[in-house]
């Protein structure tokens, strides 16, 4: 077997990037694991070097505007038509797809404790548990929010998702994504995005892993517009990392899983599909370290809208209304004067799925712990609990740095419907709404 997964795998164009990765967001990258594997000045020569096949992977229609047109050319040992066979529909376990109406959506604010890592041996595909779905995968709108609880690496197994793009948010344990485009390593504090149609397997190099997964049925994630903020801050393009080419020349039988049409399918292959020796284009997986996010905040007074913490956005057909926004609440200085500093009380047309990667969330110091989840659906009120309100209302307003904390939110324009699994989970807190019961009447018309 000839395997080229050395972290210093050859990159023909950038000698100064981090070994194994190329820097930038949405760039037209090019990389080769063998010298001369990439054709020069053309995409599909009559005969490719090393006896490779040229294949295009399109993430957008051919006629999409240039700025939104996504595609990559892959030079591989076998074309993808040899990576498919007789597909058999199999049990998707607890993985669900929108629209999913298996449970009446409770009209309530909801919160879950962390789900324990199971003792069973579960690969990535087996470990996915869907918490909420929104929109309709068949019309390429909306999303699903999942958790994963992986206890075993995928061995002689691979997967791709035809229904959506996948954004992984590790919370405990590291993940290695062995993809057609190269290898991505992630740990808590980082994210990985795997585009629709990209084949990969998930390995757990440091043991069992738990985290969150957003399945994006709509437009691909992109960087938000900065507007008056200007040319810098938030998530900067140079901090996104795309892998250099790496391949397997392996004739060992493997199983390929495909998520398509809301179902899970399987086929047997006589070889590894991770056989791309070189590639070029702008449609590829990537990773991002959330700790490089440069936050913007109030330096005078008032609490700004949480949209200033948007890392990535999946746009909809309505300008400024996201199919999904991926938002984080990172370490930052809080300095606003004469201001209630935590997030304010709120009712929102958007639906908010929140998770906590590590630390303490300032609006919910109790009950919302790392690995946990909260769901505040469209037009359901939410905000700080009694403890957070009392502290923020009475504390001395000096500059404070929020350290050791990282929360996130999947926010969508669609109501998020709770799955049967989520609604019946032992992790569901039946007393979440009680956190606001201590907010007593404080009104006194005689005291301005």
Swiss-Prot record:
One of its GO terms (molecular function) is homogentisate 1,2-dioxygenase activity. Keywords: Dioxygenase, Iron, Metal-binding, Oxidoreductase, Phenylalanine catabolism, Tyrosine catabolism. Its EC number is 1.13.11.5. It comes from the Bacteria. It is an enzyme of class 1 (oxidoreductase). One of its GO terms (biological process) is L-phenylalanine catabolic process. One of its GO terms (cellular component) is cytoplasm. Pathway: Amino-acid degradation; L-phenylalanine degradation; acetoacetate and fumarate from L-phenylalanine: step 4/6. Fe cation binds at residues 346, 352, 382. Homogentisate binds at residues 361, 382. Its cofactor is Fe cation. The keyword Metal-binding applies. The keyword Repressor does not apply. The active site is at residue 303. It catalyses: homogentisate + O2 = 4-maleylacetoacetate + H(+). PANTHER family: HOMOGENTISATE 1,2-DIOXYGENASE (PTHR11056:SF0). Belongs to the homogentisate dioxygenase family. Hexamer; dimer of trimers. Involved in the catabolism of homogentisate (2,5-dihydroxyphenylacetate or 2,5-OH-PhAc), a central intermediate in the degradation of phenylalanine and tyrosine. Catalyzes the oxidative ring cleavage of the aromatic ring of homogentisate to yield maleylacetoacetate. This is Homogentisate 1,2-dioxygenase. It comes from Nitrobacter hamburgensis (strain DSM 10229 / NCIMB 13809 / X14). The lineage of its organism: Bacteria, Pseudomonadati, Pseudomonadota, Alphaproteobacteria, Hyphomicrobiales. The gene is hmgA.
């Amino acid at each position: 077997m000839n395997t080229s997964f050395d972290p210093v795998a050859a990159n023909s164009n950038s000698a100064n990037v981090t070994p194994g990765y190329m820097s930038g967001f949405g760039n037209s990258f090019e990389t080769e694991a063998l010298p001369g594997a990439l054709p020069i000045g053309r995409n599909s020569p009559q005969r490719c070097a090393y006896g490779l096949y040229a294949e295009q992977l399109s993430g957008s229609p051919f006629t999409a505007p240039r700025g939104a047109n996504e595609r990559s050319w892959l030079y591989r040992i076998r074309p993808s038509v040899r990576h498919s066979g007789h597909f058999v529909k199999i049990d998707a376990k607890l993985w669900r797809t929108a629209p999913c109406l298996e449970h009446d959506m409770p009209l309530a604010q909801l919160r879950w404790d962390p789900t324990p890592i199971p003792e069973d041996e579960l690969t990535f595909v087996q470990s996915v548990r869907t918490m909420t779905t929104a929109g309709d995968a068949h019309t390429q709108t909306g999303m699903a929010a999942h958790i994963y609880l992986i206890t075993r690496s995928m061995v002689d197994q691979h997967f791709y998702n035809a229904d959506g793009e996948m954004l992984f948010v590790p919370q405990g344990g590291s993940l290695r994504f062995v993809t057609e485009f190269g290898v991505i390593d992630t740990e808590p504090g980082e994210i990985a995005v795997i585009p629709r149609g990209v084949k990969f397997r998930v390995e757990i190099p440091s043991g069992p892993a738990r985290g969150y997964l957003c399945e994006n049925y709509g437009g691909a994630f992109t960087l938000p517009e900065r507007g008056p903020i200007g040319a810098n801050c938030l998530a900067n393009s140079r901090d996104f990392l795309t892998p250099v080419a790496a391949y397997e020349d392996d004739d060992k039988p493997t199983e390929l899983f495909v998520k398509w049409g809301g179902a899970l399918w399987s086929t047997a292959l006589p070889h590894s599909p991770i056989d791309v020796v070189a590639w070029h284009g702008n449609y590829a997986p990537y990773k991002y370290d959330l700790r490089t996010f440069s936050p913007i905040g109030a330096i005078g007074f008032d609490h700004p809208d949480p949209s200033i913490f948007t890392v990535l956005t999946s746009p909809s057909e309505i300008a400024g209304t996201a199919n999904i926004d991926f938002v984080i609440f990172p370490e930052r200085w809080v300095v606003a004067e004469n201001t209630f500093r935590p997030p304010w009380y709120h009712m929102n047309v958007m639906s908010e799925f929140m998770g906590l990667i590590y630390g303490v969330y300032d609006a919910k110091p109790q009950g919302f712990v790392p690995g946990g989840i909260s769901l505040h659906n469209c037009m359901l009120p939410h905000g700080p609990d009694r403890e957070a309100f009392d502290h923020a209302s009475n504390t001395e307003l000096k500059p404070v740095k929020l350290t050791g904390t990282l929360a996130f939110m999947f926010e969508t324009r669609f109501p998020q419907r709770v799955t049967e699994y989520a609604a019946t989970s032992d992790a569901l807190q039946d007393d979440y709404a009680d956190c606001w019961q201590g907010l007593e009447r404080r009104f006194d018309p005689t005291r301005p």
